[in-house]
Each structure stands twice: as structure tokens, then as C-alpha cells.
């Protein structure tokens, strides 16, 4: 409930433009170019960070992007978990949704999911047996705590059948080592005819990369086929260059971060501190009186409040949704309380007490059912972030 109050009130405070009310619907006007400080205020409220510092246009058709798009669609449509017909380490290509039951458990328990697209190492030679891929882990928010990370490599049927069984191993290149030393991270046994995703636990490795971002721009992994002379290409492993297949290797990381209210409190403290330092230690001036933006209805009900990312000039890095209804509750809780007000027995008693003793407070029109907002955005050209804001939308209102 606090999330709804803070989110709605801060949206009002972020703009000096008057809102228009028609039929209890508060509509955002055509957005005019605002000062940078006001644009950043909107971004900070939704915890979307700064405008991404990307060097190239992100690819929405690779496997990393498609995975998070599938997650977003499942969350947004409130679909029931689908039955997965294959084991976690060997998913079928026929299963268009790349999400397993284990994934859904992590999705339900985390509030941020990030995918990291892979790139082929620039020095990679066509005749090399091993595959060298790199990952960009910059621009990940420092207040996120990693829970689990998985590397996913897609395997097609092998081009040669001289080895019915072989092992795929993943190694991490050690930092600042000139002798090209690698440390093994994990192995998966497979067959020449196998088609599906191979997965490797990369939790400790990704956590190390995130804690040591300054060591190198990109982090390298080496994928090899056991002790054989079989190349990863001949074994059927899809490389980052195989853009037509949309099955490139990628990392998915499940994170937990602080609640939105905690972030807003830290943001306010930081800004108050900056103002005091700029003003020589004097306290900040009192805030301006609140502006009456609308005339509330007579009775408690839910009112619309549309947030449009294009009008906020954020559509270039917010992938989905393009806009959403935040809603808020408004109106009075006056006697008699009708059925449409969803009044509790306590609210009815409190209303009667207020009639007899006016100094006692009346019930308040508040959210009774809360929903979540899910936002999908770029962090840079290689990383996509899905963040869930729990209890941030007023689904129903009532007198409490």
C-alpha cells in the first residue's frame, strides 16, 4: 500500500503540468520537453536508472532477449505454469517457451532477472576446436544481490557421428594471466544426436565478475569437448555468430534488490544531503503547498492514472510495457457506506462512531487489492533487465 502512495504522489510531484480530469480519469497531457532534473525524477521513482550507455542497438531477437520476453509475457498474462516435457539439462526445441518449472520457482522468488548476451572472442579462429565467448557485466545495479546464474548453450545434432557420447566442459579464463590459464566450472554429458539446451551453474563466476568489474571490459569463457579432437562446431554447439538461429549462448541471472520504498528513502536522503552541502549546512526550504490536481468523487472508488513511457521520453530503453495503469483510490467514506465501497465491518463501526463523536476519524479510501508492475528494459547493448514491483498497483479500493 505504501508503494502505491509513494509511486502516485511522486508522479504528481515530478511534473508542474496541470492534469485534466474527465469522468474520474486523470490523463497525462501531451508531454513537453522538461528540464533534465524533472526527467531524472521520473526515472528515479520507477528505479529505472540512468539512460543506458550503449554502444550499439540491442538485439531483441537473440536467445537472451527472447527468454526475458517469454518471462515478461507469462508474468503479465498471469498464465499458469506450463508442464515441461524434458529434463532441465536437455530441453526440446519444440518447446517454444524456454522456461522450466525450476525457472518459474526462481522467477517467483526474485524481483529482478537479468540476461547477458554472449559474443564470440574477437581473436577466435575458424579452425579452433574450442569456443571462446565473452560477456559484458557492466552497468548492473550495485544494490542487486545475485541468487543464481545459469549459462545456457544450445546443442544441435552433431555433424559427425564418430563419437556417440562426449562431454561439454566450460572453463573461466583467470584474470590478468598471460599464460592463458583457465579454471573448469562444470561439465555436461551429451550425445551426438542430442538437440536442446545444455545448462551450467555460473552463480559463483557471475558473482565474482560483478564484484571485480574493473579488471577487464569483457569476461571470457572457454567451451571444449572433453579430451577429444572434436570441435565445438562439429559437436553441434551454437556459437554467438549464428544469429539466424536465435539460439546463441547466454547467461540468466536471478537477483533480489531492495524494495521500492527503501530506494526512494535513500534517494531522498542523498538529495537532502547534497542540498545541505550546497547550501553550507542550512536546512532545505520547506516544500511548496500541494496542488489540488483533481476534484475527488463523493464516494470511494478506483481512479485511473495512466503512465506512458513515450511521453516521458523513456521508450528508447523501456521495452515493455509501453504504458500502464497505476490507478489510485479516491473519494469519501461517508455514511451510509454502500456495497460498492467494499467497506469492512470495522469501517462501518468507525463511521457510526464518527457520527456520534465527530472528533473521531472517519474510515479512509484505500487499496484493498494490490497488483504488481513488471518492467522490461535495457541496461546496455548486452544486458536486459526485468524488474517486478510488487504491490504497486491498486486493483480494488474500499473503505477501511
Swiss-Prot record:
It is found in: Secreted. GO terms for molecular function: cytokine activity; growth factor activity; protein heterodimerization activity; receptor ligand activity. Disulfide bonds join 300-365, 329-397, 333-399. Keywords: Cleavage on pair of basic residues, Developmental protein, Differentiation, Disulfide bond, Glycoprotein, Growth factor, Secreted, Signal. Residues 1-16 form the signal peptide. Residues 17-277 form a propeptide. GO terms for biological process: amnioserosa formation; BMP signaling pathway; cell differentiation; digestive tract mesoderm development; dorsal/ventral pattern formation; gonad development; imaginal disc-derived wing morphogenesis. CDD domains: TGF_beta_BMP5_like (cd13761). Glycans are attached at residues 165, 189, 201, 304, 342. Pfam families: TGF_beta, TGFb_propeptide. Ubiquitously expressed during early stages of embryogenesis, but the effect on development appears graded and is restricted to the dorsal side of the embryo. GO terms for cellular component: extracellular space. Its main location: secreted. Coiled coil: none annotated. Belongs to the TGF-beta family. Heterodimers of scw/dpp are the active subunit, dpp/dpp homodimers elicit a basal response and scw/scw homodimers alone are ineffective in specifying a dorsal pattern. Part of the signal that specifies dorsal cell fates in the embryo. Acts together with dpp. This is Protein screw. It comes from Drosophila melanogaster (Fruit fly).
